[in-house]
A protein has these predicted regions:
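Soluble non-cytosolic domains of exported or imported proteins
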Residues: 31, 42-46, 59-70, 142, ...
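Extracytoplasmic/secreted proteins, especially bacterial periplasmic and envelope-associated proteins
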Residues: 32, 43, 47-50, 54, ...
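Histidine/acidic-residue-rich, glycine-tolerant segments that coordinate divalent metal ions
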Residues: 129-140, 146-147, 158-286, 291-295
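Acidic/His- and Gly-rich active-site-bordering loop/insert found
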Residues: 19-140, 150-167
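Bacterial Sec-dependent N-terminal signal peptides
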Residues: 1-23
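Divalent metal-coordination and catalytic microenvironments
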Residues: 55, 94, 107, 145, ...
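Metal-dependent amide/peptide-bond hydrolase catalytic core
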Residues: 25-29, 78, 259-438
Length: 438
């Protein structure tokens, strides 16, 4: 009898186990949203690539992104968003209001191109030209802002389709002039904030990404706290004494003095700055002087950039630039006038927000495809948003897998190139951050 009971119990257990195996897996609401994001990202990939190629072919410079603004607004019209154009001259702000209580999340993409002739042989390569600082130049999306816009448009399409499953508001910020407004004009993130972007829309947290031509497609890199450098501009005007080119001893040559100053500036970094703390850079990007081969001119002027990742270091380097230029000029009988303009602050990733949202990036890319990197000496005006609300800015891999990092094209060059297969991850990451922000 007891054997009969035992056999019955075994059969019953086997039946229950087999029934469980045959039952479909129950998907919770979070898994459902993640699957929707993955499916919609894949479904919208070709559209996003087409958007990017159009934008790449017709780039516009800072504060002149009128066609770009119209293109973005036109392609957002079919979505369940309200659209404002013209903020900070040519910006676009689209709001997805779910109608349910929840966080107000800002997602930002920059829009402007650069005065660069494109050298990459693409069927959608830029052929745009314009006048810039008195000379004819090409216009190119040589920093990937076309990719950022297309990815954010795709993210807006995905989240609009998921509206019934979301809470709060999502503010899609298409920002002009990240590369810097023309001389005498305001622009970029600073102007958007000045015009009330954060307060008007009630933004509580801000996310942004930047495509990278030197990190592998399918990866995400980030750094907590100081992620990108502060960028300041300087000009040094050297006043000498004009004379005949054959008689330099009868004048004071501002070109030679300028050369000595340029070398002196580099010793500020290599010999006077504790680089074990943070990186720093001083670069002279332009020097102008003279009109003829046989005239030693009266003046020379140089302009350049300063990159720092620490406010104390920033202050010290500013002081040393002034002291170095003035004393070198004085030693040669010349005079140096130094002007330093404060630019973008350090791009600061809120450490609490970064730690909290890291799992979201890992869900999107896979845990092994997300890694911490050292700070970049590049600069970003996303930093202004991160001064107002907690922010997280990360890098999206865009380097083809078959290209070595050393051979990858650099940003701001005629050869800049992006692997478009990385756009899916960009959309997934931004959308995942939205659904995980509570």
């Amino acid at each position: 009898m007891k054997y009969t009971i035992l056999i019955c119990l075994m059969l019953q257990t086997f039946f229950v186990i087999s029934q469980k195996k045959n039952q479909p897996k129950v998907i919770n609401s979070q898994e459902k949203l993640e699957k929707m994001i993955a499916d919609l990202s894949k479904a919208n990939e070709s559209q996003v690539i087409n958007w990017r190629r159009h934008l790449h072919q017709y780039p516009e410079l800072s504060n002149r992104e009128f066609k770009t603004m119209a293109y973005i607004a036109e392609n957002l019209k079919g979505l369940d968003v309200t659209i404002e154009t013209g903020m900070a001259h040519t910006g676009v702000v689209a709001v997805l209001n779910t109608g349910k209580p929840g966080p107000v999340i800002g997602l930002r993409a920059d829009m402007d191109g650069l005065p660069v002739y494109e050298r990459v042989k693409l069927p959608f390569a830029s052929k745009e030209e314009t006048e810039y600082l008195g000379q004819k130049v090409g216009i190119m999306h040589a920093c990937g802002h076309d990719s950022h816009v297309a990815i954010l448009m795709g993210t807006a399409k995905i989240l609009s389709a998921m509206k019934n499953d979301l809470k709060g508001k999502i503010v899609f910020v298409f920002q002009p002039a990240e590369e810097g407004a023309p001389k005498g004009e305001e622009g970029g993130a600073e102007l958007m904030i000045k015009q009330g972007l954060i307060e008007k829309y009630g933004i509580e947290v801000m996310y942004g990404l930047h495509i990278s031509s030197v990190t592998e497609v399918g990866t995400i890199t980030y750094k907590p706290m100081g992620a990108m450098a502060a960028a300041d501009q300087f000009s040094i005007k050297v006043k000498g004494k004009q004379t005949h080119g054959s008689r330099p001893w009868s004048g004071v040559d501002p070109i030679v003095v300028s050369a000595q100053i340029i070398l002196g500036l580099q010793t500020i970094i290599s010999r006077q700055t504790e680089l074990t703390n943070e990186a720093a850079v001083i670069t002279v990007g332009k020097i102008t002087s003279g009109v003829r081969n046989n005239i030693i001119p009266e003046e020379a002027e140089m302009i350049g950039t300063i990159r720092t990742l620490d406010t104390t270091m920033q202050k010290i380097i500013h002081e040393k630039i002034k002291l170095t230029a003035e004393k070198i000029a004085e030693s040669a009988g010349a005079k140096a006038e130094v002007d330093i303009k404060i630019g973008y602050p350090v791009t600061y990733n809120n450490p609490q927000l970064t730690a909290k949202m890291l799992p979201s990036l890992e869900k999107a890319a896979g845990e092994n495809n997300v890694r911490v990197v050292k700070a970049s000496t590049g600069a970003e005006d996303f930093s202004f948003y991160a001064q107002k609300v907690p922010g997280l800015f990360f890098f999206l891999g865009g380097k083809p897998k078959n290209v070595d990092t050393i051979d990858a094209s650099q940003h701001h060059t005629p050869d800049f190139f992006i692997d478009e297969s990385g756009f899916i991850l960009g959309m997934k990451a931004l959308a995942q951050l939205v659904i995980d922000t509570k």
